[in-house]
Amino acid sequence: MILFPAIDLKEGQCVRLVEGRMDSATVYSNDPGSMARLWQDQGAQYIHVVDLDGAFAGQPRNRQSIAQIVQGVQVPVQVGGGIRDLETIEDLLSLGVDRVILGSAAILKPELVAEACRKYGQRILLGIDAKDGQVAIQGWGETVKRTALDLALEMKQLGIERAVFTDIRRDGKLSGPNLAATGELARNSGLRVIASGGVASLEDIRQLKKLEQDGVEGAILGKALYTNAVKLPEALVIARGEESVC
């Protein structure tokens, strides 16, 4: 299982939010590039970046910080937040971003998802952000009458093979991931799923590891790392199935 340290960008700073609320931001670093290197040095195989300003604005706002992150590490980087046209996708990939995540665009512009998948294949991921079972878009500020599974199946038909699934109610709260919903989505959609939201302990990672057989291939770690609730090297041992930690 792959663990993705998260770097959430707000005005060029690394922050964490609670339930996606911008007024809840806690700043952890003013240097996103060095934060990415820190996680790489601790063993990260992949970095997950979210442009929070972009998610709310509908277009990327932290391009320079994203470039610093990509240029500062040797591991691949995936980026989401405000990516709603092909030009933005191409720009991010030209910076060296490995994969881009389309969230609101899946609802607002499904034709973009289809075109991007045709052009870039597995470099395009679906971002499913759910609140109380309903998909949320536009920086999580609006819910639509669509379930996570409905959206996953629709996007699978357009070429999507992998999705990041975030339970908004758990994001930034260290309350544990929504194991049931994550496992069900992977099983019933046939997509490879990366879990996001609520991971708070090594035990949470153990439980997510058990869902690998259902198609859960990774987990995003945010606040747990920044508050030292979870130490990345120990978490990676569990993710690799080399359990002798704790």
Curated annotation (Swiss-Prot):
The protein's matches in SUPFAM superfamilies, at most eight in alphabetical order, are given as:
Ribulose-phoshate binding barrel
Give the Gene Ontology MF terms in alphabetical order: 1-(5-phosphoribosyl)-5-[(5-phosphoribosylamino)methylideneamino]imidazole-4-carboxamide isomerase activity
Q: Which residues form the active site?
A: 8 (proton acceptor), 129 (proton donor)
Which cysteines share a disulfide bond? Answer: none
Q: What is its subcellular localisation?
A: Cytoplasm
Q: Which UniProt keywords apply?
A: Amino-acid biosynthesis, Cytoplasm, Histidine biosynthesis, Isomerase
Q: Which InterPro entries match?
A: Aldolase_TIM (IPR013785), His_biosynth (IPR006062), HisA_bact_arch (IPR006063), Isoase_HisA-like (IPR044524), Isoase_HisA-like_bact (IPR023016), RibuloseP-bd_barrel (IPR011060)
Q: Which GO terms describe its cellular component?
A: cytoplasm
Task: Provide the E.C. number(s) assigned to this enzyme.
Answer: 5.3.1.16
Pathway stated in the Swiss-Prot or TrEMBL entry = Amino-acid biosynthesis; L-histidine biosynthesis; L-histidine from 5-phospho-alpha-D-ribose 1-diphosphate: step 4/9
A biological process (GO) annotation for this entry?
L-histidine biosynthetic process
Query: What Pfam families does this protein's entry cite?
Result: His_biosynth
The protein's superkingdom reads Bacteria
Catalytic activity reported: 1-(5-phospho-beta-D-ribosyl)-5-[(5-phospho-beta-D-ribosylamino)methylideneamino]imidazole-4-carboxamide = 5-[(5-phospho-1-deoxy-D-ribulos-1-ylimino)methylamino]-1-(5-phospho-beta-D-ribosyl)imidazole-4-carboxamide
Mind telling me which HAMAP family this protein's record contains?
A: HisA
Family according to the record: Belongs to the HisA/HisF family.
Q: What is this protein called?
A: 1-(5-phosphoribosyl)-5-[(5-phosphoribosylamino)methylideneamino] imidazole-4-carboxamide isomerase
Annotated organism of origin: Desulforamulus reducens (strain ATCC BAA-1160 / DSM 100696 / MI-1)
